[in-house]
Amino acid sequence: MQLVASPLETRRDIMCFEKGVECMVVVDPATRKLRIPLSCVYPTRAHQRTTIPSLCLLFLDGRCRQGTQCHQVHAALNVVAALRSQVDYLPICCALHGDRDYVNALDNRSWMSRVVVHVPDATYGGGYIPLARFSYTTPISRLLDALFHSTPQAEGQDGAQWESRAFGTPPSCLVLEAGDITLCRLHVQDRCRYAEECNYLHICKEVARCDRGLTLGQRPRSWKKPPSSSPSGGCFVVTASGTSMPPPPAAAAACDAPTPVSGGWTCPGSPTGSLFGANRSVTLGDASVTTQPAVVRCCDPSSCTEAHSVVDCGQAHIPFSLSRQVSDIHMRQVSSTFFPSDNLSLDVDPSTSGDCLAEQGCGMTPNIVVVTRNGKGGRERWHYNPYGTNGTDRGIEKGEGRGRN
């Protein structure tokens, strides 16, 4: 089979140079976007595609019968195998959940930890989401470039030197305006193969799946082009064009919040209140466990002074058939299942969303109700008091006058 004869037969917008070698940009469904040397690509109809073509997996398996009439890319098997071995792991979610943190946004000592991204349709954080909740795709890179080029920057300066030179007094927050940028729908569905080269925003999947109001795959519905004005106060808003303007008060509140801690499979909290938890069923022998969403009411974050470790609810004598958590504080389940001893463990983490405990002066006592199934097929309600009547005998107690059959 003849290799592609001339690069002139291929659309120029799917061509690039990699280390001086002319390459064709191809989406590999098994990994991500690859740059295959043009000399290793066979002629097919993929060269006349108006969009970036995909790699023909049937050809790699020796089963494609279309030959030169195939609309996908045919490339040398050994070259594809070599390129796949060089591909870094695909971004999973965001920097907070294990993706590469290119700009050190997770370091609270770094000024990048004060950068938030404005997504108008989002309810999480009032629409101002920490940069660590995004993967570094093309729009984020473009916004960060606009941030760095919006003010003079001397070569060789580190972040602190640049910040001092650019702003004089360090700003309380930096807002990247992404209201006119589309959120990637395929990323939320674990189907995007463009990785950091995607032209859409890759938002944290926890935020996307818990915020049903987000507009995926198209420009946000509530987007309105902000007016241009000079920056004022302690916050700066940066758009892709590099302009700066004073942000709404919610932006400053989002920047003042600490870097969030991952809540596992639960939805992230918010400064004003949210739903957390997910419908989840687990089977342990004869015990069937289901967790359901619970309403979270947050209190004043200023009274939270220290984080708390895992609170052990003690052992119940009856296997759980239903666990419903209703609390005035933000809780998240430590493990995805209950232990064989049927101990219920909850992690009370004020640092996640600025919630606090009754013993810290908030006056909001948690109310955790566990409904169990007894041997007669009825249901009983158990109440867990983490402090107890005298502050020491905490544990699960059977509810008085609340049993139901």
UniProtKB/Swiss-Prot annotation:
It comes from the Eukaryota. Keywords: Metal-binding, Repeat, RNA-binding, Translation regulation, Zinc, Zinc-finger. Disruption phenotype: RNAi-mediated knockdown causes abnormal differentiation of the bloodstream form into the procyclic form, a reduction in the expression of several mRNA including differentiation protein PAD1, and premature death. RNAi-mediated knockdown at the procyclic stage causes a decrease in growth rate. Simultaneous RNAi-mediated knockdown of ZC3H20 and ZC3H21 at the bloodstream stage is lethal. Simultaneous RNAi-mediated knockdown of ZC3H20 and ZC3H21 at the procyclic stage causes a severe growth defect and a shift towards a bloodstream form. One of its GO terms (molecular function) is zinc ion binding. A zinc finger (C3H1-type) spans 55-77, 178-205. Disulfide bonds: none annotated. Induction: Induced during differentiation of bloodstream form to procyclic form. Interacts (via MKT1-binding motif) with MKT1. RNA-binding protein involved in regulation of mRNA stability. Promotes mRNA stabilization by recruiting MKT1 and PBP1. Stabilizes mRNA required for differentiation from the bloodstream form to the procyclic form, and maintenance of the procyclic form. Stabilizes transcripts encoding membrane and mitochondrial proteins, including AQP1 and GPEET2 procyclin. This is RNA-binding protein ZC3H20. The gene is ZC3H20.
